Curated annotation (Swiss-Prot):
Belongs to the universal ribosomal protein uS4 family. It comes from Heliobacterium modesticaldum (strain ATCC 51547 / Ice1). This is Small ribosomal subunit protein uS4. Part of the 30S ribosomal subunit. Contacts protein S5. The interaction surface between S4 and S5 is involved in control of translational fidelity. Residues 98-163 form the S4 RNA-binding domain. GO terms for cellular component: small ribosomal subunit.
Length: 208
């Protein structure tokens, strides 16, 4: 399945919730979800009764869209989460949160996860001092990512760097604004993850 390249605001409207796919725009009055609270399409304003399966499917789709994951990748993440000890839903969120692109976003080096993915693909960061361009790399406790020297002076990153520190990273991450680096200091717990998801619905869907 190809990655979605259409208008991302339609995805938020489809899910009926802000997925924060367009960075700062999502926090302004320009957000499509605030302006049009109904789903996109000709029949978007019609009221629909959603089945239990439909609710589970929508929650899975929402999770995929929030983290920018393809269907096959998402199934693989769920299978890994199910193999691990502990609560499967929480394991799933932990795997998604510790992806490199998500950590770049959480630290404030990007305004959206999609932007973070592009930054990683274009070699703007190092991981533990080495070049990295794979957004899906799973980070572990102690891993350090850093913005490359040659990237610091670009107009785009100057704007982002100026805003670093205005938003506090989650408790499991540590940001150093002086070295423009971030460290994973713990694995995220459920209470550390502010993503608006009901992961138990996803578990129920895959348990059918």
């Amino acid at each position: 399945m190809a990655r979605y390249t259409g208008p991302v605001c339609r995805l938020c409207r489809r899910e009926g919730a802000k997925l924060y796919l367009k960075g700062e725009r999502c926090y302004t009055g320009k957000c499509a979800v605030d302006r049009r609270t109904y789903a996109p399409g000709q029949h978007g304003q019609g009221r629909k009764k959603i089945s239990e399966y439909g609710l589970q499917l929508r929650e899975k789709q929402k999770a995929r869209r929030v983290y920018g994951i393809l269907e096959g990748q998402f199934r693989a993440y769920f299978a890994e989460a199910d193999r691990q000890q502990g609560v499967t839903g929480e394991n799933l969120l932990r795997l998604l949160e510790t992806r490199l692109d998500n950590v770049v976003f959480r630290l404030g080096f990007a305004r959206s996860r999609n932007e973070a993915r592009q930054f990683v693909l274009h070699n703007h960061f190092t991981l533990n001092g080495k070049k990295v361009n794979i957004p899906s790399i799973q980070l572990r406790v102690g891993d350090v990512i850093q913005l490359k020297e040659k990237s610091k002076d670009t107009p785009l990153f100057k704007e982002i760097v100026d805003g670093l520190g205005q938003k506090t990273p989650p408790a499991w991450l540590e940001l150093d604004v002086n070295t423009l680096s971030g460290r994973v200091i713990a694995l995220p717990k459920r209470e550390d993850i502010d993503t608006n998801l009901q992961e138990h619905l996803i578990v129920e869907l895959y348990s059918r």
